[in-house]
């Protein structure tokens, strides 16, 4: 049953649950989510459920712990979900100070991940932080739980239930990690694959970096011009064996420079031009090669940030790829407003973007 937020200052958790037009489509998620919420309530955690975006008022979701639960129709659509996206985009900072998790229940094998990435990007740009691995995704067949089902000996539906309960706890328990550098300085690894003299993205990063100099130690690594090989797909045992030693079978710049810098860092900044509406090949290889290290080390206290510059459009698509790779898959924290997304085509035209110095300074201030 839907209740309002405004007069319930004791709420520990807000569940934003835009129901699909077909009530039967929500039955599977209802049967998993509602008992988990009742158990939390019995343990002293209050929650409020919102099913209609029209009930929200600016300020309702600021400073909250939030679960976004979305059920999709057979066609992969939930009309109320799109109203939710519109609300986030129309109300700047409406999620400031909030921490979120996402549950997507699909009716087919398609659309769940794409919808979750778009939701995460829009909510994040409105101020929502997402802890590492904030998504519980259930495809129509529950086939995406096959591996965990085999490992645990549980049925896919039981694995789904366990994942939802774990996500509730993760969102409620999340705390911001402290910087690990001397005197509280932030340790940042910036990764790029651009030519500094011609790259708008690098020019923008240089402006952002200026705003970080007094409180961060920054290591910059270039992975351009064939300095990095992509992942070749070793079996799990081989990958884990090398990862335990902070290495990868294929060696090179990844094991010599990137892995040590990443392990020491508090935050990674992806300096990322838009190539064909995608992360460029060398940066994609960098992401793929992190798998060996991820198998053996915990990245859940590290933050991911991005500077994305497009020649025409599509910066949101590239940002969503970074969310999928680092936040959904590699467990990095997605801080509020994690990406600075700009458009600049001709060389050095980023310098002519209105208020670019102010924007760069504001973004630098968000890197914590």
Regions found by a protein language model. Give the residues of each.
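Extended, H/D-rich, highly charged conserved domains that either
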Residues: 193-198, 222-224
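FMN-binding flavodoxin-like domain, especially the glycine-rich phosphate-binding loop
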Residues: 2-192, 196, 203-216, 259-264, ...
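Short, conserved beta-strand edge motifs with alternating hydrophobic and charged residues
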Residues: 221-222, 270-272
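Flexible loop/N-cap segments at domain edges
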Residues: 254, 264-267
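A general structural motif
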Residues: 224, 249-254, 284-291
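Redox- and metal-dependent alpha/beta enzyme cores, enriched for Fe-S-associated oxidoreductases
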Residues: 207-208, 219-226
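Cysteine-cluster motifs in flexible loop/terminal segments that predominantly coordinate metals
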Residues: 226-259
